[in-house]
Amino acid sequence: MSDKKIKGLEWQEKPLSDNERLKTDSNFLRGTILDDLKDDLTGGFKGDNFQLIRFHGMYEQDDRDIRAERLEEKLEPLKFMLLRCRLPGGIIKPYQWIEIDKFAREHTRYQSIRLTNRQTFQYHGVPKGKLQPMHRLLHSIGLDSIATAADMNRNVLCTSNPIESELHQQAYEFAKKISEHLLPRSRGYLDVWVDGKKVESSDDLLKIEDEPILGKTYLPRKFKTAVAIPPLNDVDVYANDLNFIAIQDENGQLCGFNVLVGGGLSFEHGNTKTYPNVAYSLGFVPLEHTLAAAEGVVKTQRDFGNRSDRKNARVRYTVQNMTLDGFRAEVERCMNIKFEPTRPYEFTERGDRIGWVKGIDNNWHLTLFIESVRITDKPEKPLMTGVLELAKVHKGDFRITANQNLIVANVAEQDKAQIEAIARQYGLIQEISKLRENAMSCVSLPTCPLAMAEAERVLPDFISELDKVLSKHNVADESIITRITGCPNGCGRAMLAEIGLVGKAIGRYNLHIGGDRAGLRISRLYKENITLQEIVNEIDQLVARWATERQTNEAFGDFVIRSNIIAPVVNAHIDFWDATKIIPTTII
């Protein structure tokens, strides 16, 4: 970490968090993980290794549904790992999917592939003894899980735009370049998981390894990046630490990016020093300076981000402490160029185009709605087998979207009928409401250790209840972006929803409303600590008013603000916790 100290960074006078010691002592992220892999007495990892595996894309979890039962039997919790693959832009080849499916069926507790809103897949329930075989499998098919968790740049998102195929390809290539450029240089991942090579001392490593961008202690906290192609904001570009908005020239070619920083949706119940936030614009950079801008933002966060209090360590808090102008100046110093003024752009929607769409290259793309985003086989819905059968015949690629759906991309005209027939045979094509189409949740129980309430498992039935409400008020064809997250950590991006539920306790949630369709506005707390049925009753009353009092084409989130049902969040660091402090301009 740099020894630079500037006004507003009082944290530098405080003790560092223990995570900083952990990273320093880790032998460039190797730790003693190899020793733990040989320990058959526990299904988990000990000491620092419990956290270090996160830098390799894994979390230790247990099945909370049976935790109490196992404790009564004097057994440790049923421990296993979550694996999150690194998949910039969400693109995966059919041959890779076939191998991923095989491992999930044979070696994971839940025999499922979970799609995430970070455009990748997760394995849940991987036993410790299968971790090295899993990583070696990924490596053999050109994949890995490096830096998909912990204090590094995580999986880079990119708009899944199947229509503008040329522009999407250009933006996707930059998403891949950004991901590769910001990866750790350490061979720790390969040494532990692929080669199985033990390194004894960090002294020798210092001679052969360096982290010129991330630094020896990496970043202060998680760091998320997205690339968006207007007018579609499917990646929720305002919700990330670093964001690139694609700008086209007069010929429709990608000419550069607007760069935004300081988005993020996590907060802590009752902790007014934490808040969700939409990103701020630094300005525009031409294509040739894209990687320099990414590196400059990362280095600024590396040097000035809070390493004392991890709850205030994301980029938005660094921007608040340095001021936006101060943050911009440091990024410009790092990249040795100035930002140009922000170029005009507009976002109009966030949802996926479910069903078939034709690209400008005449290829077809089929977007499949995956409810609860867990691809598994059930008697009435053998979705996992269905996707596997698609992978066996598909000649294009798959794209996991930031809305947790799956695109069968680049289907030739002559192959379209076969792809559709398979998808219909296995229940992958279905008639659903607009409300369900735009609903999303995090994983939550039973595997997430942070979960305070259900999310993934209650979302389908909750949406069914809201569908009844919309039908009752004759707005069944309308869309309201609805999201549930099991805790305030933000994984379900509920704070950018028109209706957002944040878990508070088992069976109880905080209800937030007032986000907008384009993902530009944070929602505000409306009712606290209430049940799902109470939430349905509240939404019933609000939808009744919306159906009769709204203006032409007025979205639900816009209506509740215009009608003064709820005050907008204007400057989250000032007014998220107290609507009486709303002021019209951002002061940071």
Curated annotation (Swiss-Prot):
It comes from Actinobacillus pleuropneumoniae serotype 5b (strain L20). [4Fe-4S] cluster binds at C442, C448, C487, C491. SUPFAM superfamilies: Nitrite and sulphite reductase 4Fe-4S domain-like, Nitrite/Sulfite reductase N-terminal domain-like. This is Sulfite reductase [NADPH] hemoprotein beta-component. Alpha(8)-beta(8). The alpha component is a flavoprotein, the beta component is a hemoprotein. Siroheme binds at C491. It holds the Pfam family NIR_SIR. Gene3D superfamilies: Sulfite Reductase Hemoprotein, domain 1 (3.30.413.10). PANTHER family: SULFITE REDUCTASE [NADPH] SUBUNIT BETA, SULFITE REDUCTASE [NADPH] SUBUNIT BETA-RELATED. Belongs to the nitrite and sulfite reductase 4Fe-4S domain family. Component of the sulfite reductase complex that catalyzes the 6-electron reduction of sulfite to sulfide. This is one of several activities required for the biosynthesis of L-cysteine from sulfate. Binds 1 siroheme per subunit. Pathway: Sulfur metabolism; hydrogen sulfide biosynthesis; hydrogen sulfide from sulfite (NADPH route): step 1/1. Its cofactor is siroheme; [4Fe-4S] cluster. Its EC number is 1.8.1.2.
